[in-house]
A protein has these predicted regions:
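Aromatic-anchored transmembrane helix interface
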Residues: 18-25, 39-63, 70, 74, ...
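Extracytoplasmic catalytic/substrate-binding loops of multi-pass membrane glycan-assembly enzymes
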Residues: 50, 226-239
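Membrane-interface helix termini and inter-helical loops of multi-pass transporters
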Residues: 39-41, 94-105
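A membrane-periplasm/extracellular boundary helix in multi-pass inner-membrane enzymes
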Residues: 177-226, 240-248
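Luminal/periplasmic active-site loops of membrane-embedded glycosylation enzymes
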Residues: 112-119, 218-232
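Membrane-interface helix caps and helix-loop-helix hairpins in membrane proteins
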Residues: 34-43, 155-157
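Alpha-helical transmembrane segments of multi-pass inner-membrane proteins
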Residues: 30-31, 67-97, 109-180, 192, ...
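Transmembrane signal-anchor hairpin modules in multi-pass inner-membrane enzymes, especially those
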Residues: 1-30, 62-69, 73, 128-141, ...
């Protein structure tokens, strides 16, 4: 921020579509304050969304391409340490941190945020295993170990959005690995791996089983008024409203 050259940085931000979308996304929340019925809650949401205004655009101006591998390594290390803390809470070796509980051990952030970050960490590790031809056997074994432990960790926490992202990520990785010429094989392998992991997690993790049963129940009775205020009901409502807005505009 204090390094100067602000004109170049500004041009760098506005020329990046992701950064512009990030700023517009935040701006929509600010604009929404004009018609909200609960200004206090609206300001709370705006505060939560402030990362979209500051974090991504600022990171874009200070990151350098030649250091990307170090950024990725630092992120993987951070998620590995967080995962270890999660297991320590789960096994009751340490007292729960932040808002974590033994039943939902997400020590450094809420389960809503934790699982998407964990999914991204798993994706980066799996990508290294599958596509880095220069990866030594030792690193490969270490990466496989943490990919497995992170995947298990995914299903002892309650973040359904991250779990959905996890299964989508697996499909993407498999299709990337087999390429465009072997779509049928990639589809079959994706279905086998994803369904096997899902069934294994469902039968072995009580919290995952409970969250899945809850989601199915909420969807099945969505049309009743008492169900629309659940997390699943709200997501369905937001999706329907968004599609209507897109359709009408």
């Amino acid at each position: 921020l204090l390094s100067g050259n602000y004109k170049t940085k500004f041009n760098q931000i506005i020329s990046n579509k992701l950064a512009v979308l990030s700023i517009l996304f935040f701006s929509l929340h600010v604009l929404g304050l004009l018609w909200t019925d609960d200004l206090k809650w609206g300001l709370t949401i705006v505060k939560k969304m402030s990362d979209f205004l500051f974090l991504l655009p600022i990171l874009l101006t200070i990151t350098k391409k030649e250091y990307i591998k170090y950024y990725i390594s630092a992120f993987i290390l951070a998620m590995t340490l967080t995962e270890i803390l999660s297991y320590l809470v789960w096994f009751e070796v340490i007292d729960p941190l932040h808002k974590a509980t033994v039943g939902n051990p997400t020590p450094t952030m809420s389960h809503i945020s934790y699982n998407p970050f964990l999914t991204f960490g798993i994706f980066l590790i799996a990508h290294e295993i599958l596509f880095n031809k220069h990866l030594s056997k030792l690193y490969k074994y270490v990466y496989v170990f943490f990919m497995v432990t992170m995947s298990i960790n995914m299903f002892i926490t309650g973040g359904r959005a991250g779990q959905v992202m996890y299964f989508v990520m697996l499909g993407i990785l498999i299709f990337q690995y087999y390429g465009r010429g072997r779509k049928v094989r990639a589809t079959i392998i994706s279905l086998i791996i994803i369904s096997s992991i899902f069934l294994g997690a469902y039968n072995s993790s009580s919290i995952f089983q409970h969250r899945m049963n809850e989601a199915v129940k909420n969807i099945s009775i969505y049309n009743t008024d008492r169900n629309k205020n659940t997390s699943v009901g709200q997501r369905i409502t937001y999706t329907i409203n968004s599609l209507e807005i897109i359709k009408n505009n």
